[in-house]
Swiss-Prot record:
Its main location: cytoplasm. This is Ribosomal RNA large subunit methyltransferase E. GO terms for molecular function: rRNA (uridine-2'-O-)-methyltransferase activity. HAMAP family: RNA_methyltr_E. It catalyses: uridine(2552) in 23S rRNA + S-adenosyl-L-methionine = 2'-O-methyluridine(2552) in 23S rRNA + S-adenosyl-L-homocysteine + H(+). It is found in: Cytoplasm. Its EC number is 2.1.1.166. Keywords: Cytoplasm, Methyltransferase, rRNA processing, S-adenosyl-L-methionine, Transferase. Belongs to the class I-like SAM-binding methyltransferase superfamily. RNA methyltransferase RlmE family.
């Protein structure tokens, strides 16, 4: 996730610190008011999750059953850590027996059972470091990575789709057979080459927009279920696209 470190923001102001309205632009004031009144933000605070994004993963899992039985999980773009919290609980991960590896270029407060790497996933050393941290083939690769937005929709889409593609190829490289891949993408179309690659390597590929994803947001999630293994038949015919929900 492309978010500020926990406990503060890029301005250095502590979370929860009151700000004089006169110093805020109208758009910033509206964002703060929406955030404070967001029922998912309130639920996250009540249930101990670090971000409302936890409910996106939980809602997707409620329908698609991707978390049950997972023994190892890799979380890409993990900060501030709500998906890693869920992953650690699902895998019964502990500091003595860590089964979750997470990565983000932003800081992230420690989570019991999660090995966190503060580095850019696009760093050439990142994939190998994650493999070593997880200690075996993961059953799930999660990616909530998104490039910082520029305000230009096409540019933002291209940059985030690049992260999605890199994450997808990493998933195919490391997943255990039968594993799943879930990644953030933006509305505007998923590149055909990426969809074809996923269709060749997974048994089902769908686009998902959970209810907890804000209606005005362009984000969606690409879910690839049932990894066929690295010996998938080359003769498998790729589908034309992913189903949408």
């Amino acid at each position: 996730m492309t978010k500020s470190p926990i406990g503060g923001n890029r301005s250095g102001r502590k979370l929860g610190q009151k700000v004089k309205k006169g110093k805020l632009k109208a758009s910033s004031r509206r964002w703060i008011e929406r955030h404070i009144n967001d029922p998912y933000v309130q639920r996250a605070q009540l249930e101990g999750y670090r971000a409302r994004a936890a409910f996106k993963l939980l809602e997707i899992d409620e329908k698609h059953k991707i978390l049950a039985g997972a023994k190892r999980i890799i979380d890409l773009g993990a900060a501030p850590g709500s998906w890693s919290q869920i992953a650690a609980k699902v895998t019964n991960s502990t500091d003595a027996d860590p089964r979750v590896a997470a990565i983000d270029f932003l800081e992230m407060d420690p989570i019991p059972g999660v090995r966190f790497l503060q580095m850019d996933f696009l760093d050439p050393e990142a994939p190998e470091n994650l493999k070593q941290a997880i200690g075996g083939a993961p059953d799930i690769v999660l990616s909530d990575m998104a490039a910082p937005t520029t305000g230009h929709r096409q540019t933002d889409h291209i940059r985030t789709m690049h992260l999605c593609e890199v994450a997808a190829h990493f998933a195919v490289e490391v997943l255990a057979e039968g594993g799943h891949f879930l990644a953030k993408t933006f509305q505007g179309g998923t590149e055909r080459d990426l969809l074809n690659m996923l269709k060749q390597n997974f048994r089902q590929v769908v686009h998902v927009k959970p209810a907890s994803s804000r209606a005005e947001s362009v984000e969606m999630f690409l879910l690839a279920k049932g990894f066929k293994g690295r010996h998938a038949l080359e003769s498998d015919e790729p589908a034309e696209g992913a189903a949408e929900e």
